[in-house]
């Protein structure tokens, strides 16, 4: 299994102005450092929580299907863009995003998944994860956690 970031977040969940207010910093001398700290704090929380704060696109590669239901390792998942087996896209109607806390996909018809012909990485699942496109979409407790780490 490998997980690759295809499209990263367009913005950070915490603005430079919010971080500077929290830190009680005036002026612009430390702006680049503070912006770096905001990104580092977000990345740390995302890695520890297996989540995406701002909308991102990911590709999950598998050697074989783990079962009839596939858990996606990052959430919250808003959409599955496509599923490829040996480079060929499955029809969107062939699978569903299972609702619930953990992001999972399953075959819509409960049929078995088509097996890849190769030995490694023959399955690719592209999906969108994140609370939304803006920092205001991120839950307040995560916003506050970023400020505390900064």
Where are these regions (language model features)?
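Divalent metal-cofactor coordination and adjacent catalytic microenvironments
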Residues: 1-149
């Amino acid at each position: 299994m490998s997980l690759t970031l295809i499209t990263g977040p367009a913005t950070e969940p915490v603005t430079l102005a919010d971080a500077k207010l929290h830190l009680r910093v005036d002026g612009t001398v430390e702006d680049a450092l503070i912006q770096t700290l905001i990104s580092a704090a977000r990345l740390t929380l995302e890695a520890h929580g297996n989540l995406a704060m701002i909308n991102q696109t990911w590709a999950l590669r598998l050697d074989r299907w783990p079962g009839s239901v596939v858990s996606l390792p990052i959430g919250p998942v808003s959409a599955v863009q496509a599923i490829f087996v040996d480079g060929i896209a499955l029809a969107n109607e062939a699978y569903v995003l299972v609702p619930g806390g953990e992001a999972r996909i399953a075959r819509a018809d409960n049929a078995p998944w088509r097996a890849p012909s190769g030995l490694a990485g023959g399955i690719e699942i592209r999906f969108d994860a994140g609370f939304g496109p803006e920092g205001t979409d991120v839950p307040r407790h995560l916003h506050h956690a970023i400020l505390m780490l900064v």
